[in-house]
Every structure is written in C-alpha cells, then in structure tokens.
Amino acid sequence: DPDLIIIDSIQTFTMENALPARAGSPTQTMECANELLRLAKDDKRPRAVIIVGQMTKADELAGLRALEHLVDTVLIIEANSDEELRGLISSKNRFGSTGETGFFQMTEKGMESIDNPSEYFMTKREDGDLVSGSTLTVVKEGSRAIIMEVESLVSKTFTPYPTRIAETLGKDKLNTLISILEIRGGINLYDKNVIIKTTGGMRVKEPGVNLAVIMSIVSSVKNKGIPTDVAFIADVGLTGELKKVPSLEGRVRELARMGFRKVYVAKDSFAKGFKIE
C-alpha cells in the first residue's frame, strides 16, 4: 500500500469498470481524478498523489478547468526546446504562496537546481570586454530578484518587411518598444531587422525590462558596448518617459550583492532615506 502515488499522465488513464468513455475524454479524466482525490483524502490511510498532466500550445493545462480546481497545488514546468533551462512555477497553492519560480538545468542526470540564478543568466566577461547589444536588468520571479541579460542584434534588411524576433519577450511588445525608440528617440529602424533574446531563454512578461531592451537595441545600432557593471530597471511609456517598477529596492540590493555600481531607474523611484546596507 504506497504512501506516494504518481500518475503520468492523467489523460492516459481510464476506469474501465465504471465508464465506457475513451481515455482522455473529459468524463474519464474527471472520474479518475475524483478517485485519486478519494485515495488522497482517505482518513484512515491518507496518501500523497502527484498527477502529471499535459499542456496546450497556449501554455495552459490541457483538459477541463475543473481538474485544476480539484487539486491542492498546480506546478508547471516551463521550457524551450532548444534550451537547458527549466522553470518550475507554482500557479496554485492552497498551503502557501503562488507565483514563486524555481530554476533548474536539464543535465544527463536529470533536472539539477540552479542555486544562483543571477549568475546563471549573466554572460561572464572580463573587465573592459564590452559587447554591443548586451544589457543587464533585474526581474522579479515571485519573491526572488534575478539579474538577467538582454541581447539584441540589429541588421539592415533586404526585404520589404524587416524581421522582428523576440520569442522570450513577445513580438507585440518588441514592436511597441521599436515604435517608441523611433518616435521618441529618433532612431530609424524601419529598414532594420531586430532580434531580441534573453540568456537562458527565460520568458519575460513584466514591463520593468523595457528600458534594458531599448538600451540593448541602441547599443547594437551604435555598435557600442555598455559596461558590465551597469543595469537598467524601468518601464518606458509611449511618451518615452521612464516609469517606476514595483519592488525596486529588492532588485537594487541584488545588484549590489553581485557587485554592480550603477543602475538607471525612473525618477523618484526610491523611498526617501533608502540605503543599501
């Protein structure tokens, strides 16, 4: 009688004696899940049950939403097929906080924890070794502040429609930032291909990286590198003005811990009297 039950995956299981429906159907999936719930919540013999499910191309749980409501915790493993990085995200947790992310590296031994994500996401370069198109910022993943590198490559296009690639950022956000840079910054990119990437293939949704993305593009266009001890943390409005981002103090403390000397932020971002110990 096991203490731990792992089902991989719920869409392949059936209760043949109870239901004639095929495996993976909504009815079968919910009946199997309810039976597993009964086993887990048995007062005389409680067990831990882990249900492995499938994801859709839209990064949502496949199947009925009721399945997500049935369980106590939902953990999602995010990955890009061409990267070793794996992110373990808690999207639901009845017994703790959500929005937290754990980072792992896929190796021949399996998933191994990345204990210092900030160091992992930065390219190690010698002092004075400046590379154009590279900037650094700090993102928040749950309660953690993580330093991340943004890379861009800008080149002349020879087609009527320039290429815009930003898998980890989002094409719509990239086009918006390019428009701001053209109108407010006076840098023409209508005849330029623009490719944006974050080291490790980390997906970025928060607006606090926008200034770093813009400065990365400018650095690539001008072919001038930015010092490796400088970071950019701010949103950029359609007017071209810098906007504050939340949890800035924690981000700056992470930069100080890693030896950074300068950070560009929006005006009046810090509370009066803020100091880095």
Provide a role label for each language-model segment.
Residues D1-L4, I10-V52, T56-E277:
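Peripheral, non-AAA+ core regions of ATP-driven protein-machinery
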